[in-house]
């Protein structure tokens, strides 16, 4: 019984599999919120299309990490895991010129 209680408590209080939520198009603006992110190696970032579609995430010099498919629907979401230490600049391809750019610090 104690094992079952411990298991259920662990599942109930389990954290999401990602480290950070990032809103794409936050508050009606062409921005990532937050735009500067600190995570540990192996952690994931959860990107959510908040509004003003379409959005995607291109990670500079890392096509294997990029999510180039466009998220058209508000609420559409995806995760990107960053396995190695380093600084990763990312942007939304359709809105890079408008300043929709961010950076991930993995350490």
Would you name each region that the model predicts?
Residues 17-107:
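Extracytoplasmic copper-binding redox domains, predominantly the cupredoxin/blue-copper superfamily
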